Amino acid sequence: MPSNMKQFCKISVWLQQHDPDLLEIINNLCMLGNLSAAKYKHGVTFIYPKQAKIRDEIKKHAYSNDPSQAIKTLESLILPFYIPTPAEFTGEIGSYTGVKLEVEKTEANKVILKNGEAVLVPAADFKPFPDRRLAVWIMESGSMPLEGPPYKRKKEGGGNDPPVPKHISPYTPRTRIAIEVEKAFDDCMRQNWCSVNNPYLAKSVSLLSFLSLNHPTEFIKVLPLIDFDPLVTFYLLLEPYKTHGDDFLIPETILFGPTGWNGTDLYQSAMLEFKKFFTQITRQTFMDIADSATKEVDVPICYSDPETVHSYTNHVRTEILHHNAVNKVTTPNLVVQAYNELEQTNTIRHYGPIFPESTINALRFWKKLWQDEQRFVIHGLHRTLMDQPTYETSEFAEIVRNLRFSRPGNNYINELNITSPAMYGDKHTTGDIAPNDRFAMLVAFINSTDFLYTAIPEEKVGGNETQTSSLTDLVPTRLHSFLNHNLSKLKILNRAQQTVRNILSNDCLNQLKHYVKHTGKNEILKLLQE
């Protein structure tokens, strides 16, 4: 069996494999905690001194009558930031000593500092667990500065504090768009609660408009999955923090490249256009889309009769929550069975096909259950954020951290935290019974529109509002209550309308905007003159 780790949950584990003597010194100086990402808001980076001379000096001072010099040198090797690549070695960055690091030059795989003239390269064999913001660099020559100008560490939770660290690896076109939107959202929330423009709304509408105009089959595939909360829609469609697998809902070739979306803004009145997408659910045509097996056109019921889909979903709710044994073992298994039926047969209680073939094919292997639990969790976190009397960046940071590190979409079944039977255990084999609050969240999930989710047209929502059920209420809440709860978010977002008067249709203007973005102003002028 191999004796060395290939991925690391801690920097100390990597040190144990490479330099146990240095690890022992760090431990003896009570500095192991300084290498933990949990200690810092923005992760941690360790600079390992390759030069034996520096390590010998650390050892000599550590075991002397005054180990302060060894402590200071070790502190200079610890950066309270997650810096995985040279591209992130920018801005106000310093070591644990508080000394600012001045970068002289960055190359593809190397950073050269001015002060100390240290030459740093990323440790090729250090790969952290996906949810750990840890990095290790090798100092090949020079030294880290012990004195110099201080760097200005941003205040935790302060007004200028970014919602999440900007350093993330890998830095893909998807993550670039997400980080830009997150920064814009944090800025506008602190200014006016995004009452003028909501960045998540703008980008979600733009992406859907692009698909509708340029890739109608992709548009039909994703339309049943859009959410009344544009923040949820944005992350489910873009999947910006997924780093493993190629089962993206929307392929890379459609999103990026010479003819891709590339994050272009394509909207005139964001709120009105967003609501319009929900009215389109019952107005799609499938004359040119046939089932790959039968070659017959079979209109998915999520489009032809969404109300009946939700009626059947309510039957499933009732069966699960009125089951003879509502408990932490039986109930999650019944949830999984319902999702297995949907994934494998595209039916709910043998009624179907629920989704277009392309949609259900994209949701297999636990992805549909993962998506719906994601909706439920993010809805809850977002509601908490919006219910606060004053906006707190830290509340928004919690949402983004959850998406980045707990639910990136790398392993759907392992990222299930509420609905997976494995979280509750089997009392006959493990005796592991989950806390009551987790089970209460499962019941709330079943009692929400997020359970077996399909989008429903806004005009189909009606009825008198009733009191929302509590987390432990086993009686399914009526359908209109679920939907009115999410639709209430649209009342807030109505303030985010941006209307531009024009004599061209929205579709025409959106096509022109995308053309200008990727071909240049002169070309569009030539086109208009023809």
UniProtKB/Swiss-Prot annotation:
Name of protein: Polyprotein pp62
Site description DNA-binding, residues in chain: 10, 39
Keywords assigned: Disulfide bond, Host cytoplasm, Late protein, Ubl conjugation, Virion
Outcome of substituting residue 141 to A: In strain: Isolate Uganda
Organism: African swine fever virus (strain Badajoz 1971 Vero-adapted) (Ba71V)
Family statement drawn from the similarity comment of this UniProt entry: Belongs to the asfivirus polyprotein pp62 family.
Effect the entry attributes to changing residue 39 to A: Loss of DNA-binding
Site entry: Cleavage: 158-159, 463-464
Example of a GO cellular component annotation carried by this entry: host cell perinuclear region of cytoplasm
GO BP terms in the entry: viral capsid assembly
Effect noted on mutating residue 165 to S: In strain: Isolate Uganda
Stated induction or repression of this protein's expression: Expressed in the late phase of the viral replicative cycle.
